[in-house]
Amino acid sequence: MTNIRKTHPLMKIVNNAFIDLPAPSNISSWWNFGSLLGICLILQILTGLFLAMHYTADTATAFSSVTHICRDVNYGWIIRYMHANGASMFFICLFMHVGRGIYYGSYTFLETWNIGVILLFATMATAFMGYVLPWGQMSFWGATVITNLLSAIPYIGTNLVEWIWGGFSVDKATLTRFFAFHFILPFIIAALATVHLLFLHETGSNNPTGISSDADKVPFHPYYTIKDILGAFLLILALMLLVLFTPDLLGDPDNYTPANPLNTPPHIKPEWYFLFAYAILRSIPNKLGGVLALVLSILILVLMPLLHTSKQRSMMFRPVSQCLFWILVADLLTLTWIGGQPVEHPYIIIGQLASIMYFLLILVLMPAASTIENNLLKW
């Protein structure tokens, strides 16, 4: 008799995705981040659900309701901090996952890659709206500044901003709709992640060499289930160290002050995971130009497959491209640092140079290096 997991309509799907899935025998720990992102998403949905039971999306009571969760709800503080720091872990995993994709040429799986870029945008939108909900100073002013960027769109900009606000400023209507969107988006992300996985399983996973691994596959279970469980333990360990020892390390002190439309904080900045894009936005002295650069800084990922000029898929055997990749990582870390600094000398010029370097590396230097490496192979 055939095993039920191979015949049952529902179990068959799970079996083909997580048990009998043929996986390359040589995928490294960089391939762990997909499952870690799934764990992060589940964790965020669960903690978010419990927070929503006690939160009120009203300008008069939102800040107080978050304080109430932390002070009066049983284990409310741990749920709140797991949710806030869970977002940081989510983005660490996301950046690692995307970086892996760039390094090993995984972007040649076009559908998988493009859905991944949509997932990145959706996650960024969710995180932004979630940051507005506690209704602290940085929540309010962050929402005001970022939504205001849409006014740079010619002709329809102003109307669009007022439509999103639900009035003439960020107010009760804005908070209510942001809560609604923040609640629904993670489920859309979960659905998209399923499609992401569906397309990945059409082709099978890439591997560090970038060469077809059809001749050498192993079953996903037990080899990669145990590996994913180890990764999950390390993720939970890192998250709980953050939550239990330094829960406010990555937050902004300004967000412990209730939102006040009459008092602007001296330095408006988003959470750390948006700082690189924020630095690119600020480095262009024109509003529309800055907004375009901001969007392009993420949308440029869609161009990755078109910019792939190398005869090899992975960077594993391409030292020049490897060097440029790590310069890109250093550049992104520089942008992240600049995004958190005030707009003054020397930070302005450093940010502008780092922004130019970012686009130059992806659009010009990396494709050029690939072409040079192709020619070196002929020698």
Curated annotation (Swiss-Prot):
UniProt cofactor note: Binds 2 heme b groups non-covalently.
Family the UniProt entry places it in: Belongs to the cytochrome b family.
Keyword set includes Mitochondrion: yes
Function: Component of the ubiquinol-cytochrome c reductase complex (complex III or cytochrome b-c1 complex) that is part of the mitochondrial respiratory chain. The b-c1 complex mediates electron transfer from ubiquinol to cytochrome c. Contributes to the generation of a proton gradient across the mitochondrial membrane that is then used for ATP synthesis.
Cofactor(s) the protein requires to work: heme b
Broad class of where this protein is predominantly found: mitochondrion
Quaternary assembly: The cytochrome bc1 complex contains 11 subunits: 3 respiratory subunits (MT-CYB, CYC1 and UQCRFS1), 2 core proteins (UQCRC1 and UQCRC2) and 6 low-molecular weight proteins (UQCRH/QCR6, UQCRB/QCR7, UQCRQ/QCR8, UQCR10/QCR9, UQCR11/QCR10 and a cleavage product of UQCRFS1). This cytochrome bc1 complex then forms a dimer.
Membrane spanning stretches: 33-53, 77-98, 113-133, 178-198, 226-246, 288-308, 320-340, 347-367
Subcellular localization: Mitochondrion inner membrane
Keywords: Electron transport, Heme, Iron, Membrane, Metal-binding, Mitochondrion, Mitochondrion inner membrane, Respiratory chain, Transmembrane, Transmembrane helix, Transport, Ubiquinone
Protein name according to UniProt: Cytochrome b
CDD domains associated with the record: cytochrome_b_C, Cytochrome_b_N
Record: residues binding heme b b562: 83, 182
